[in-house]
Amino acid sequence: MTAFFKTLRNHWKKTTAGLCLLTWGGHWLYGKHCDNLLRRAACQEAQVFGNQLIPPNAQVKKATVFLNPAACKGKARTLFEKNAAPILHLSGMDVTVVKTDYEGQAKKLLELMESTDVIIVAGGDGTLQEVVTGVLRRTDEATFSKIPIGFIPLGQTSSLSHTLFAESGNKVQHITDATLAIVKGETVPLDVLQIKGEKEQPVYAMTGLRWGSFRDAGVKVSKYWYLGPLKTKAAHFFSTLQEWPQTHQASISYTGPRERPPIEPEETPPRPSLYRRILRRLASFWAQPQDASSREVSPEVWKDVQLSTIELSITTRNTQLDLMSKEDFMNICIEPDTVSKGDFIIIGSKKVRDPGLRAAGTECLQASHCTLVLPEGTEGSFSIDSEEYEAMPVEVKLLPRKLRFFCDPRKREQMLPSTSQ
């Protein structure tokens, strides 16, 4: 034993390196063990739903999964098959997985797809936007859009995951929680933005549209990968050297928020008795007729704004969902063009992690419908749900509570008012 410790002391560099390697290996193995425990617990919970009996005349629920294998730098397929697929199969659903091969394929497939009970998106913001656009471009979108949508966050950017699921630093737990939310069946309504250019078909967004210098610098961050943790600040610093001040000129016309109509019951109420129907007919017959002027809807008031901004964003409220709001609107945020170079680098670096961050002095407008007009010859690009589109004049319309998404029951309870209040 003495000789053993003497050898360790004489070769202390190798001993130190070996201990570090052993510690790292133990930590890695422990993490894998914890991930397996999470998967097992999620599968056991899903199996409870799969073991439930269904009526003889009922059919097994069909789920169609749109999987983007290229998401998360090509790791999405492995993440889905290890963490999500077993849960879906154990839940008793008839699962069909559609793997997309190229950008825009999900959009085309959805325009032709037959009806299903559940649509599941396994990918990031780009895949989700394709699926939503494909659903809402269908000729029968009024009925097809009622199909609930599940979102399994596998991409590098998954903006809605913070709204729909509990926060988790563990990737495996985040994916299993999202998949279990689909199995449990709790849903929340989310707004959609319809963005229409002059010629092309409309594009639909769950998060919003960004146009400006912060966005342009953010997409160049990967170009400076060799700078490691400094790459984000470097992208914004070099952006200030190209042109300064960076301003974007445009004009925008918009209408204000609209009152939210009462929520319609999902189940059809029972037909009233014959006696009640007769009384209702008599009451409507003897009721005073309304004047035509009282039935007229007041015309919408449009407001015009000329803007000079460093960045413009038009966003839904899905990232800060309020189920009890009495108004429906989208946010138009006009950030000031007086931002200094230092603030541009600091704020821009934070915006890469949190696109909802705003510079001091930002003007926010509430609108239900707007048109954005750009000066002739304007170059650059929009980001619509993290996907790049050519900058052009667009019409943006809010479709309030258009789609229903599966949500973690714990998150849904937090959005509703407490019964004790």
UniProtKB/Swiss-Prot annotation:
Component of the TIM22 complex, which core is composed of TIMM22, associated with TIMM10 (TIMM10A and/or TIMM10B), TIMM9, AGK and TIMM29. Interacts with SMIM26. One of its GO terms (biological process) is lipid phosphorylation. Pathway: Lipid metabolism; glycerolipid metabolism. Residues 58-199 form the DAGKc domain. It is found in: Mitochondrion inner membrane; Mitochondrion intermembrane space. PANTHER family: ACYLGLYCEROL KINASE, MITOCHONDRIAL, SPHINGOSINE KINASE. The keyword Mitochondrion applies. It catalyses: a monoacylglycerol + ATP = a monoacyl-sn-glycero-3-phosphate + ADP + H(+); a 1,2-diacyl-sn-glycerol + ATP = a 1,2-diacyl-sn-glycero-3-phosphate + ADP + H(+); an N-acylsphing-4-enine + ATP = an N-acylsphing-4-enine 1-phosphate + ADP + H(+); 1,2-di-(9Z-octadecenoyl)-sn-glycerol + ATP = 1,2-di-(9Z-octadecenoyl)-sn-glycero-3-phosphate + ADP + H(+). Gene3D superfamilies: Probable inorganic polyphosphate/atp-NAD kinase, domain 1 (3.40.50.10330). This is Acylglycerol kinase, mitochondrial. It holds the Pfam family DAGK_cat. Belongs to the AGK family. Its EC number is 2.7.1.107, 2.7.1.138, 2.7.1.94. Residues 252-271 are annotated as: Disordered. PROSITE patterns: DAGK (PS50146). GO terms for molecular function: acylglycerol kinase activity; ATP binding; ATP-dependent diacylglycerol kinase activity; ceramide kinase activity; lipid kinase activity. Lipid kinase that can phosphorylate both monoacylglycerol and diacylglycerol to form lysophosphatidic acid (LPA) and phosphatidic acid (PA), respectively. Phosphorylates ceramide but not sphingosine. Phosphorylates 1,2-dioleoylglycerol more rapidly than 2,3-dioleoylglycerol. Independently of its lipid kinase activity, acts as a component of the TIM22 complex. The TIM22 complex mediates the import and insertion of multi-pass transmembrane proteins into the mitochondrial inner membrane by forming a twin-pore translocase that uses the membrane potential as the external driving force. Residues 15-31 are annotated as: Hydrophobic. Ubiquitously expressed. The modification N6-acetyllysine is found at residue 6. It is a peripheral membrane protein. The gene is Agk. One of its GO terms (cellular component) is mitochondrial membrane.
